[in-house]
Amino acid sequence: VWEDYTYYITHGIGDNTAKNFAKRYSEWWCDRFDRVIVPTAKTENLLRQYGVEAPIDIIPSGMDLRRFAPERHSAKERAATRAECGVPEGKRVLLNIGRLAKEKNLEKILRVFPELHRRLPDVQFVIIGEGPLKQTLQEQAEALGVADSVSIVGSKPWEEIDRYYAIGDVFVSASHSETQGLTYIEAAASGLCVCAVDDPCLLGVFKDGVSAILSGDGDEQLLESLMLSFSPVGTRIRRNAVEAARPYSTEQFAQRVENCYLTALGERQRGLSPVVL
């Protein structure tokens, strides 16, 4: 969502003006098309709030789910990747993969981690990614006294990212800036229990307590959701995770996009397409 990223241009100076420009530009641009494809109802609702009037189709982005299949990774490979990420033998892994930036809300997760670690000392928090917040997160972990149990390992090649998902037990996110959140799907396809602060982008994607653990915004709520994720409930969700990710395959995505294009072509042939002024 462009309005969530204007800070990187304005650095806080005139940011409201930049956000309004992003909204107006989005409206102008989308209304020039016969149909608009968005990944979630959250994005559709946002565009409607901007004033977009063009027909909108909700088609979640697809991915090659086969590359994330848990059985692709041997115990030997997992052990080597865990060692690479600084995970001691016998530890369970709380995992986050993504850009280390303020909109991802990683500071919230780190705030609750000391208490999670006090209750579950066998949990290691592994953060994979790069971004402007990396040093801040390292300093926060040190200040909270959990630096030895937090591994911030930097970015990894996209071609190998499935290998890093494979070491996780629970995938955590507190972001509200996602339009779809592909990392949630990648984590589920990798057989992890997804624990996320609830967000409209997850509507229709996961069912709380069945295919993921969805938390409220408060720190205490996130802590309790993480505890639940490492309980037998989380173990059950992990068994269902791969099936929950199945609707997001590249094959289903391609079929839905083809149907959308056929609809747009049919409307244009019948003279039903909107006129762009």
Regions found by a protein language model. Give the residues of each.
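Carbohydrate-associated surface elements
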Residues: K42, G62
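Short hydrophobic beta-strand element within catalytic cores of glycosyltransferases
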Residues: C193-A196
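A conserved mid-protein helix/loop that constitutes part of the nucleotide-sugar donor-binding site
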Residues: R92-E115, F125, P132-Q138
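Short alpha-helical donor nucleotide-sugar binding micro-motif in glycosyltransferases
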Residues: S155-K156, R163-G168
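Conserved acidic donor-binding segment of nucleotide-sugar-dependent glycosyltransferases
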Residues: D208-E220, L228-V233
